[in-house]
Amino acid sequence: MAAPPQLRALLQAVNKLLRQRRYHAALAVIKGFRNGAVYGVKIRAPHALVMTFLFRSGSLQEKLQAILKATYTHSRNLACFVFTYKSLQALQSHVQGGTHQMHSFLAAFIGGLLLFGENNNINSQINMYLTSRVLFALCRLGVEKGYIPALKWDPFPLHTAVIWGLVLWLFEYHRPTLQPSLQSSMTYLYEDSNVWHDLSDFLIFNKSRPSK
């Protein structure tokens, strides 16, 4: 069934507008907002679903509400951050007549402060995720620029051993310093596996169901 003429004309007008270069910066901001919202849902919804049903107590309704709230918060913040970042990038480029490396840092600095500056569980997870990747990237950049000498051996095994040694030491003796979701995961792995009563909570369930 063919679309009505009015709808076809509207779609043609919209597509013509989208192809005009003079509106590209503004349209990129809008699409960035869209992509941020979609990516936030893709990343947070599965994570919240798994973590909530594994570690959170409460009714099914409470669990679903927690999943929806976490997904909405992540999606909204990421969408607004992309919108803010691309808007500030475009503004700086327009004012200074070109792009500079510092523009990216300043735009993201302001956007990060505004959208991810609140100290909560979701922002903490996002920032820690980025911290590890930024440190890796800076080390690689340092090697590329010659500030850090390139090693003749692969440091990855040593790095892995140190990280795993530290995280288990922190979990066993300084647990409050670890992020809550990491504490929950490690408790499930290393402490809950020390307790069982019969076959049901040895192989089938993690913990025995309360008797009625």
From Swiss-Prot:
Glycosylation sites: 206
Predominant subcellular localization, coarse grouping: membrane
Tissue expression from the record: Liver.
GO BP: ether lipid metabolic process
One Pfam match: Tim17
Membrane disposition: Multi-pass membrane protein
Record localization: Peroxisome membrane
Source organism, top-level taxon: Eukaryota
Keywords for the protein's UniProt record, in alphabetical order: Glycoprotein, Membrane, Peroxisome, Transmembrane, Transmembrane helix
CC annotations in GO: peroxisomal membrane
InterPro entries linked: Pmp4
Residues annotated as transmembrane: 97-117, 151-171
Family: Belongs to the peroxisomal membrane protein PXMP2/4 family.
Subunit structure: Interacts with PEX19.
Protein name: Peroxisomal membrane protein 4
Protein's organism: Rattus norvegicus
